Amino acid sequence: MNRSPMNKPTTPQKQSTGIAPPQGRLGVLIPGMGAVATTLIAGVNLIAKGQGRPFGSLTQMQKIQIGHCNDLRFVAIKDLVHLAEPRDLVFGGWDITPENAYQTACDAGVLSQDMLADVRQELEVITPWRGVFDQSYVRNLMGSHVKTGASKMDLAKALMDDIRKFLVDNDLERAVMVWCGSTEVYSEPGPLHQTLESFERGLRDNAAEIAPSMIYAYASLMCGVPFANGAPNLSTEIPALIDLANRKGIAISGRDFKTGQTMMKTIIAPGLRTRMLGLEGWFSTNIIGNKDGEVLNDSGSFKAKEVSKSQVLDSILQPDLYPELYGDYHHKVSIDYYPPRGDNKEGWDNIDIRGWLDQPMQIKVNFLCRDSILAAPIVLDLIFFMDLAQRAGLQGVQEWLSFYYKSPAMPDSRKPEHDLFVQHLMLTNMLRTLAEEEALDQSDLSENVEKLIVR
């Protein structure tokens, strides 16, 4: 793989020129109204009241460079491109338990009772619709608040009815769906997932190979709503739904929010490769006690997460190019469910490296993080960027949003980029392009080098 940071992602097909402004309010549809979703919703309302700041959100905090040479300037992302405003978001969603967003947020324990008391009214009015659930895909959960239907196609149509009613009731013309549900068991695309026709036949025939997340994704796309997959399981990543997204002109992205330990890997590993330091092994373990940890305590769901977390190092280190440095390293990933820790995830990494004359060294990382606190701003950014992509006429897989995912979906057979800094450049260069600014390149460096050359 050519690793030049100037490489651009495949630009999704444009349906029209220009970007429609974000007029009116924006609907946010969330399958899985749990800790992440309620932390997001509470946070948006608290920030609006001046009781918190949106740290972790690029759309709300980051400024990027535009121009070059003697015309360098930094502009906030939200000022560079036309984004919706947090105050314009209208939330709705599904869950397999009936508690409203305030009750769920209290049970999750991510935010203090004092903080939640200030937004109780805003949270209590958000009651989830009955969810689509299949326990064979999430074995450690039970659902009491679920939809029933004669077929999976009937369930998809029921979701479409929910979406359309939500849009009408709230006078919305635009919406985005972000999967915040639990990790489903590991699966790979099969014959049924290859074409839209075979997939729809499978919906009608109640095919076991169709997971609930795929039903949500299908319903979302059929209603013209962009879909982002925050979990490691397959949903819009199957050929049938990629085809549907392209046919309908809808933006999709995924998969698996990059929040804690994997984020740190995609920061540290590029540094090791850049310095040509060898790697003997990378041992990673986590403890977490929230519902995500409970779900991942099942081997099927854990495998989906393990595959997602394990593939980043090879992509970054390129052992095929550097077999002496990275050709034979050991990589171990584990997650342990530890209920007392709740949403406060802790990750330990032991990294055995080699330097000059093969001399051994170690790096130790102890990351005490808060899962939903890291995930909420990712969801917020994806809401705004997926809406931007849709208004800009970008359809299909949004490779430029790889920055937010552990296992980025790709529009073709290429392997995804995992280097966080390259991913960030891909994202910001897409924003520059949409703003009709020049993409960041090497021109400034080249001019500076020219000045240093003695003729």
Region locations from a protein language model:
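Metallocofactor- and cofactor-centric catalytic cores in central/energy metabolism, strongly enriched
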Residues: 7-231, 235-247, 261-269, 362-455
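A generic structural signal for short, non-catalytic loop/turn and secondary-structure boundary residues
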Residues: 84-86, 170, 272, 344-346, ...
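Short, mixed-charge, low-aromatic patches
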Residues: 198-202, 219-229, 306-309, 332-342, ...
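Histidine/cysteine- and/or acidic
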Residues: 227, 251-254
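Short flexible/disordered coil segments
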Residues: 233-248, 287-298, 315-324, 342-355, ...
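Conserved anion/nucleotide-ligand pocket segment
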Residues: 253-255, 259-324
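Glycine-rich, aromatic-lined ligand/substrate-binding cores of catalytic
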Residues: 309-399
